[in-house]
């Protein structure tokens, strides 16, 4: 008898799913590739499109699927700038992930929602994520200062 399958949209722009698998501990691993062409040169700021290989494989946490933790696995593309001296390479930045974050932006949003009326410790336990990972979401996504210059009036609730 064939195993039943369900298709779940990732809702991530500019990616193609290459493979899905469930590892030994029951986590869903989704191998993807970017379909976005080009990136911005880290030195001159121009758009560059000359491919120059790939970074190492990267695995980041994504939204849970049917109660299972899921991870996105991909190799970021590298591009070379032919205008700058030394022809430096730049890793493609993706709209759905912040640089150096262990999570997708969608998972960051999920964790922030879980933090409503909960502590960092509570969310860490519920999600099976390290305390520092949950704290990192707060530090990356929530501003600790207010730009009062953007407000002309404060209303009364």
Residue ranges and their predicted role:
Residues 1-86, 91-94:
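Short, conserved DNA-binding cores of transcription-related domains
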